Amino acid sequence: MGMGYHDGMKTAARAQVNTALREDWLRTLAALEETLQAWVAQEPGWATQTGETDTISEEALGDYKAPTLTIHAPDGELRVEPIARNFPGRGIVEVYAWPTAFRVRLIQAEPGEWRVLTDSGIYLRQPWERAPFMLLARDLMGADAMMPAA
């Protein structure tokens, strides 16, 4: 049985919504990247490098590639990598550190407002501002140095 007129209209409408939502998500990620680059640029000895994810597949958005950011610091590196738009909230981005391999996730609560979610499922009670993010970045990269000696 072929596709009817209404089925074709639904498919076209869904494709338009998917494209609009995907483009909005990519704009959101670009804005996050710009914010983090501006914050990091103020730190002596820190630098950023942009990149792109492998293909991400989401039912509502289709297949797409998203921007990534690597933050180079004297004590290590942070990788900022989008995971998905369709997540409770308005998207999820993973932030993980090298050499510690510690990570947190950024959950977009409102446009331009991100909340930090730990692996324990606890949201950090910090505003989305430069100083708390830079402290978090340092803690993630050097967390093993803060552990008591055995």
List where the protein language model places each region.
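Charge-rich, low-complexity N-terminal segments
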Residues: M1-S57
